[in-house]
Amino acid sequence: MRIHLVAVGHKPPRWVRDGHETYAQRLGKGWRLELHEVGAGGRGNDDPQAREREGERLLRALPSRAVCVALDEGGTPRDTRQWARSLERWSHEGGEVAFIIGGADGLSDAVRQRADACWSLSPLTLPHMLVRVLVAEQVYRAWTLLSGHPYHRS
């Protein structure tokens, strides 16, 4: 199962790289978590043009055959078991999924329209760099649930 994390922003802080790599390396045989970074659209406060530029870059970075899940505070809330069930289903259907993380100004309409699903990690607004670590941990947690590993405790 190939899981792509397609995210806005280059050069994340060390704690973000370390967190992402920690969980990516823990995944068991047959599961890979790959990071694809795209450049930010510019600097500005809620700049719609910057969001559109980021959206174009995100869309170009998406693997063509992957199920695409946009991550957005307005998306559908999903608990850990729902993450695990979805990943399990997608692994049986072809084994590729892309989680899309926008930049500081969120996701463009084009990205939302391309997405097969839109999920929320929290009703809180989260820093996009922190979301990378949260997604990596949830992917690992889902794998442990599906593998019978004792990491997840209900």
From Swiss-Prot:
Its main location: cytoplasm. Gene3D superfamilies: 3.40.1280.10. One of its GO terms (molecular function) is rRNA (pseudouridine-N3-)-methyltransferase activity. It comes from the Bacteria. S-adenosyl-L-methionine binds at residues 102, 121-126. Its EC number is 2.1.1.177. Belongs to the RNA methyltransferase RlmH family. HAMAP family: 23SrRNA_methyltr_H (MF_00658). NCBIfam families: PRK00103.1-4, tRNA_RlmH_YbeA. Specifically methylates the pseudouridine at position 1915 (m3Psi1915) in 23S rRNA. Homodimer. This is Ribosomal RNA large subunit methyltransferase H.
